Regions:
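Beta-propeller folds
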Residues: 1-219
Length: 219
């Protein structure tokens, strides 16, 4: 879809009642800004619904070198408090002054790397789609709250969540070990989605845990 006002539009999602919608927009279609995205919100209950930009590509809280990712599925919380979105590292611009025949590609093997080069190649498409979870609170406009980062990339917000706490699994400390031991291991954290604070609950776990919707109990 496209409109003269919002430019290229993608990833349209509605809330459960279909009273609101969010979508990605690429307002500047020039090559220099091809990786930049804004997020728009539309109140469909209005007499004449119109979309407004709530998450611009340079919003406060976005880490340096990162951008809004249209690979993540936008989702409005059931209570309408926040929007779940994804953030990714922006690709570095290619050096067009170097001819293709002079460019060299190398596989660098390091003993302490999270993934072997062969794993990176096999899972290339999955890694490229991977995003870091962030939240936009409607009562705190002009900023986003990063819940995930490079040290703890796996954060999932359950759709039935009613409280402010989620469980986070962090496998990063055990990725090198996984190269010879297939047993999945991770540290378990409790994460407050209102302020981003994390609390370590348990280390070196081999079984997954679930949290009650209100965030009071974990099993």
């Amino acid at each position: 879809y496209s409109t003269p006002k919002e430019g290229l539009i993608s990833g349209i999602k509605f809330n459960e009642e279909a009273t609101a919608a969010v979508f990605y927009s690429r307002r500047d279609t020039s090559e220099a800004t091809k990786d930049l995205r804004d997020i728009f919100y539309a109140d469909l209950t209005a007499e004449r619904p119109s979309a407004e930009c709530i998450v611009p590509s340079d919003i406060k809280g976005l880490p340096e070198g990162m951008g809004i990712s249209d690979k993540a599925t936008l989702r409005l919380s059931k209570d309408g408090r926040y929007l779940v979105l994804g953030v990714k590292e922006l690709p570095e611009p290619e050096d067009e002054t170097v001819p293709d025949f002079e460019k060299v590609s190398l596989d660098i093997w390091r003993w302490d790397a999270d993934y072997l080069p062969t794993q990176v190649k096999i899972n290339k498409s999955r890694f490229e789609r991977q995003t870091l979870t962030a939240l936009y609170y409607f009562d705190k406009p002009g900023q986003i709250l990063m819940l995930a980062d490079e040290t703890m990339p796996m954060v999932s917000i359950p759709e039935n969540l009613t409280g402010n706490t989620v469980l986070v699994l962090n496998d990063k400390p055990y990725r090198v070990e996984r190269q010879w031991d297939p047993t999945p291991r991770y540290d378990l954290y409790r994460l407050n989605i209102e302020n981003g604070e994390r609390e370590l609950i348990s280390r070196n776990r081999t079984v997954r845990s679930t949290l009650s919707p209100d965030g009071r109990y974990a099993a």
